[in-house]
C-alpha cells in the first residue's frame, strides 16, 4: 500500500493538513472540489459515480447540474452557499457540500440549505405539494461523532418509536473523512473518503484504489493538468491557508503566554489551580480576539474567519 504523509489531527485539522503542494491538489478546498465534481473534464461522470456509491438504493443513471443562479439563491432572494447541486433523470435532487469545520447549529444549517431545493421545485407551478426527493450530502473534514468509528451517517424523517418514514422527500448523508481508512476490506465509499482526505499527500496512486471513479478523481486532482491560471489560484489558496495557520498558532502562543501570566496573578490571590485555569481561558480568548482582528485587517473573507473562530473556540 502506498502510504500518505502523516495527517494532523485535532480541531485545526481542516487548515493544518494538506498544506504541502505536491503532485495532486487538495480537492476538499471549496474551489477545487467544485472544479473536480462540476467543471473539469469528466466531472459529471465523477459526480454520478460518487452518488451511485453513496446511494446504491437509488437507480441514478444520469445527472444534470443546477444553474449557479438557482443553486445559490433561495426563493426569498437571499444568497446561500452550496458547492454543487444536481438532479438525476427521475428528478431527484442532490445537494453536495464540503464541510470544512464544525460549527454551532451544524445540523440546522444542513436542513436550512436542503429545503431550498424543495421550494424551487414547488415554485415551478401547480397547487400540489408533491416534490422529488432531496438528498443533502455533507463531506466533512472533521469528526462530528468523536466516540464512534463510523464514518457514514444517514438520516431521514421518520416516526420516533417505529421508524416508519414520514416522507421520502428529505435525506441527509454525512461522510466523516478523517475516519476513513484504506484497508483490504474497505468499502468503496470508505476508499473514496480516504482518497478525498489524503490525495494531496500522495506521490503516487495506491494500488487499492482501482476503478473508473479513482481514474477520474486522480486525473481531476493532478496539478500538471491545471491551467496556468488555476495553478496560480491554487498556490494563492494554499498560501492563504498557511497564513491563517500561522496567525492561529501565533494567537494560541500569545494567548497561552498571557494566560500563564494572568493565571499566576490570580492563583496567588484565589488559589493556584483555579486561578491558573481561569487565567489561561481569559488569555486564550484575548489571543483569539487579536488574531481575528488581524485577519479582518488583512482582508481575509468573513466566511473563512468564522470557520477559524469556530475551530479556535473548541476545547
Task: Give the residues covered by each predicted segment.
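Elongated, amphipathic alpha-helical interaction scaffolds
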Residues: 2-315
Amino acid at each position: 500500500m502506498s502510504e500518505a504523509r502523516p495527517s494532523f489531527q485535532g480541531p485545526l485539522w481542516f487548515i493544518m493538513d494538506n498544506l504541502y503542494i505536491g503532485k495532486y491538489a487538495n480537492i476538499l478546498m471549496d474551489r477545487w472540489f467544485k472544479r473536480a465534481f462540476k467543471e473539469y473534464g469528466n466531472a459529471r461522470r465523477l459526480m454520478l459515480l460518487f452518488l451511485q456509491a453513496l446511494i446504491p438504493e437509488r437507480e441514478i443513471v444520469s445527472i444534470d447540474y443546477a444553474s449557479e443562479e438557482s443553486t445559490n439563491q433561495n426563493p426569498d432572494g437571499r444568497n446561500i452557499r452550496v458547492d454543487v447541486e444536481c438532479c438525476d433523470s427521475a428528478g431527484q435532487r442532490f445537494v453536495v457540500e464540503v464541510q470544512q469545520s464544525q460549527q454551532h447549529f451544524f445540523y440546522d444549517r444542513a436542513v436550512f440549505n436542503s429545503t431550498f431545493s424543495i421550494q424551487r421545485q414547488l415554485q415551478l407551478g401547480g397547487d400540489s405539494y408533491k416534490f422529488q426527493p432531496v438528498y443533502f450530502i455533507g463531506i466533512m473534514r472533521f469528526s462530528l461523532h468523536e466516540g464512534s468509528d463510523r464514518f457514514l451517517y444517514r438520516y431521514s424523517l421518520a416516526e420516533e418509536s417505529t421508524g416508519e418514514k414520514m416522507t421520502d422527500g428529505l435525506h441527509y448523508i454525512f461522510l466523516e473523512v478523517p475516519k476513513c481508512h484504506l484497508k483490504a476490506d474497505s468499502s468503496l465509499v470508505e476508499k473514496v473518503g480516504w482518497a478525498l482526505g489524503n490525495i494531496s499527500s500522495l506521490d503516487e496512486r495506491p494500488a487499492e484504489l482501482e476503478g473508473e471513479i479513482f481514474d477520474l478523481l486522480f486525473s481531476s486532482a493532478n496539478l500538471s493538468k491545471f491551467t496556468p491560471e488555476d495553478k496560480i489560484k491554487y498556490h494563492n489558496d494554499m498560501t492563504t491557508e498557511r497564513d491563517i495557520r500561522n496567525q492561529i498558532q501565533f494567537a494560541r502562543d500569545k494567548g497561552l503566554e498571557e494566560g500563564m501570566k494572568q493565571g499566576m496573578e490570580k492563583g496567588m490571590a484565589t488559589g493556584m489551580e483555579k486561578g491558573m485555569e481561569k487565567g489561561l481561558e481569559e488569555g486564550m480568548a484575548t489571543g483569539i480576539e487579536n488574531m481575528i482582528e488581524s485577519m479582518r485587517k488583512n482582508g481575509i473573507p468573513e466566511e473563512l474567519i468564522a470557520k477559524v473562530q469556530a475551530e479556535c473556540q473548541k476545547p
